[in-house]
Amino acid sequence: MDKNEALRTFTTGENFHLQHYLGAHQEEVDGKVGYSFRVWAPNAQSVHLIGDFTNWYENQIPMARNEAGVWEVFTDLPKEGDIYKYNVKRSSGQEILKIDPLAVYLEERPGTGAVIRTIPEKKWKDGLWLARRKRWGFFSRPVNIYEVHAGSWKRNEDGSPYSFAQLKEDLIPYLVEMNYTHVEFMPLMAHPLGLSWGYQLMGYFAFEHTYGTPEEFQDFVEECHLNNIGVIVDWVPGHFTINDDALAYYDGTPTFEYQDHDRAHNYGWGALNFDLGKNQVQSFLISSIKFWIDFYHLDGIRVDAVSNMLYLDYDSGPWQPNKDGGNRNYEGYYFLQRLNTVIKLAHPDVMMIAEESSSGTKITGMRELGGLGFDYKWNMGWMNDILRFYEEDPIYRKYDFNLVTFSFMYVFSENFLLPFSHDEVVHGKKSLMHKMWGDRYNQFAGLRNLLTYQICHPGKKLLFMGSEFGQFLEWKSEEQLEWSNLDDEMNKKMQGFTATLNAFYKDNRPLWEIDLSYDGIEIIDADNVDQSVLSFIRKTEKGDMLICVFNMAPVERKNFTIGVPVAAVYEEVWNTELEEWGGVWKEHNETVQSQEGLWKDYPQTLTFTLPALGASIWKIKRRIKSKSTKNKK
């Protein structure tokens, strides 16, 4: 689109490729090759371009303002690699140096200047992956995500984080070995503190240089795709860093943030909230995420802190009701609908995932029916309930068995993703393994049971790094994972267990083919409170099934009986208590032939030994003839 159309659509909130208009761009004007610079600062008294090519303040270049509040200038002084900023004079007369909000490259800390660099055109080799992704989608495919903080998965001997060139060599083989389908990174956009988690951003188009270069991340994504691994990145469109040299009060007045002081300030996080109803902000944010999807070939976006965008009273600070007297933030609601509409029109096969904890808004519902249009929502209720249950002494579990079963009441009210994320292994919450009840042996048994339950429960899966091998200490963002734990036999066996469990998940269609309706699950018994045993069936469209049985008590149950719908010889295909994974069983249960006899609504029974704190999964090995009628369900 030409410059006039780019400017018009920016002001109407319809420019979703803003990086082609604002920022620095190499152009030829009147026979001179140079760079055009454009920045939105509608209420600034003046804006000057300064940088290496002006000797900074000595020869700063004045910029001209157009009718939409965009300041621009063309100059042939800059060269590739030069650093620049905008010197913005506010209405008060104060001058302040600001970053270029559209910069793709920022200088290394402690500086925050933008770097003039021509974005190279990558010749991608992942066409087959993208074609398969488009053909298959993801709703009826396995999705098992390994969540990673790029700065602390592994570190160099000098304590510096791995670059993505290093992660390409180490992390991708690990993902393949561990049989994950996707990897999700905490924010990779530029943020002020390199050792932070990255959720207060300053550069929405810039790659965080702590982790290397944009080109290195492109190569990482490509290599993931060549190894059949999808890549998801966290994105924060609700709030941004309060740092003076970034987006905050860019021209001296509320520019990217709300006009109202209390709405603009996120008191709980010490950040500023985007004015999601402002057209220019919508163009900026949607352009940001489209750029990341297009430039890096991302397979999914996890939108952080959605509740903060939906509810006026989400923060701990003062708030004012909306025009209807309620707490709904209509600007945030409509922005998220529009965001998903735009992304889905361009990339229907890219996952849009919401981190959202309330039940007051339909997050994954159809936009036409009032939903927000996300593909998945984190199931925070399930996660909180299930962790509380597994931390509890088994003596009391029968009184709280509803913590395990309650999710079946609402499991398909949204398209859920089941997260054991970074948020659950910090700030004194203990690591996932350390949360488990009992001594060291029982903690590992509990963790094997828990991860198997997550894999069998309807919904896509996410596990934060370190939990796969039972790291004992909490996650520390300034240190690498406790890889030395793997010198311990129990941790090494736990790692092998998780890798095998992930492969089992991928190889068994009943666990993922029907994740969005009750057609994919049938409860056998959710009422065995006294023994703390839960059993259900996962199914495919063709009727293939897995019988999943979970013993949440440290008591081995011999001659344990459940009902099954089909007369058959059944074989145990999964047992969490095998010796090779740290348990005490030397081998699986023997195959068992079902017996005729009514058990609840089931015409057949299956009797076997259920391991203590164990999970046992069975499948049909061979059907047999029976006079009994099939289960009426």
UniProtKB/Swiss-Prot annotation:
Catalytic site: 304 (nucleophile), 355 (proton donor)
NCBIfam families (alphabetical): branching_enzym, PRK05402.1, PRK12313.1
Catalytic activity: Transfers a segment of a (1->4)-alpha-D-glucan chain to a primary hydroxy group in a similar glucan chain
Domain of life from the UniProt record: Bacteria
Iron-sulfur as UniProt keyword: no
Biological process (GO), any one: glycogen biosynthetic process
GO molecular function per UniProt: 1,4-alpha-glucan branching enzyme activity; cation binding; hydrolase activity, hydrolyzing O-glycosyl compounds
Subunit structure: Monomer.
A single GO cellular-component term on record: cytosol
This protein's record includes keyword Glycosyltransferase: yes
Name the UniProt record assigns to this protein: 1,4-alpha-glucan branching enzyme GlgB
Function: Catalyzes the formation of the alpha-1,6-glucosidic linkages in glycogen by scission of a 1,4-alpha-linked oligosaccharide from growing alpha-1,4-glucan chains and the subsequent attachment of the oligosaccharide to the alpha-1,6 position.
Keywords per UniProt: Carbohydrate metabolism, Glycogen biosynthesis, Glycogen metabolism, Glycosyltransferase, Transferase
Assigned protein family: Belongs to the glycosyl hydrolase 13 family. GlgB subfamily.
Enzyme Commission number: 2.4.1.18
InterPro entries: A-amylase/branching_C (IPR006048), Branching_enzy (IPR037439), GlgB (IPR006407), GlgB_N_E_set_prok (IPR044143), Glyco_hydro_13_cat_dom (IPR006047), Glyco_hydro_13_N (IPR004193), Glyco_hydro_b (IPR013780), Glycoside_hydrolase_SF (IPR017853)
